[in-house]
């Protein structure tokens, strides 16, 4: 779960970190769901409870490590989309490559995606190099419009871009016996039969990813024997501070 800034938590390990004005979240798995909790299911990061507003879908976005491309990516699931570095991405767009210090906005909530100083595959990390391709995305300018961006009249964008998302509670259909969950927008998720419907990876999937990840680490010269060793090493190199020009609400 996301931790409030200043809560005194000693848990500072993860492959990546989400940092907002008033919360931080350390990724300790290779795939997390951002959205809002409901009576039927929970998500890894409940943005609604963090002040994300009424435009948060129950399953709004997924951040995951793409083992094929060896990078973190964002998959947009919620109909209101996500902003990454001021560009709106909608469901059906290609997955978005995430670089360290990328600014994300979902609903009224702004936060940074941060990686350790050194890549999990070796080599220093730098900020995003912007290359505009032919992807069907909608640009949005002036997302650093002034202090307090993300809420109120001086927020980074108008609420008119959004639809009120009150229909998500019926959005999922259980396909009994198939282990699949389908959303009306065509996306599918998979969960083990009989387990509580939590939008996350199964234990078997996580363990398989752990083994694959450790193999990549050994190939990159990292002397670690278990996944906790990777967490600790990455946490020790974690990006603790954001340059002043990248802080939330900076004019």
Curated annotation (Swiss-Prot):
Gene Ontology cellular component terms for the protein in this record: nucleus
FHA domain: residues covered: 32-89
CDD domains: FHA_FKH1-like
Biological-process GO terms, alphabetical: regulation of ribosomal protein gene transcription by RNA polymerase II
Sequence ranges of Acidic residues compositional bias: 163-174
Keywords: Developmental protein, Nucleus
Induction statement: By auxin, cytokinin, gibberellin, abscisic acid (ABA), brassinosteroid and hypoxia.
Segments of skewed composition (Basic and acidic residues): 182-206
Subcellular location(s) of the protein: Nucleus
Disrupted gene: phenotype observed: No visible phenotype under normal growth conditions.
Broad class of where this protein is predominantly found: nucleus
Residues covered by region (Disordered): 163-209
InterPro entries to which the protein is assigned, alphabetical: FHA_dom, Fhl1/FHA1, SMAD_FHA_dom_sf
Physiological role: May play a role in the control of plant organ development. Does not show transactivation activity in yeast.
Protein name stated in the entry: FHA domain-containing protein FHA1
Biological source species: Arabidopsis thaliana
Gene name of this polypeptide: FHA1
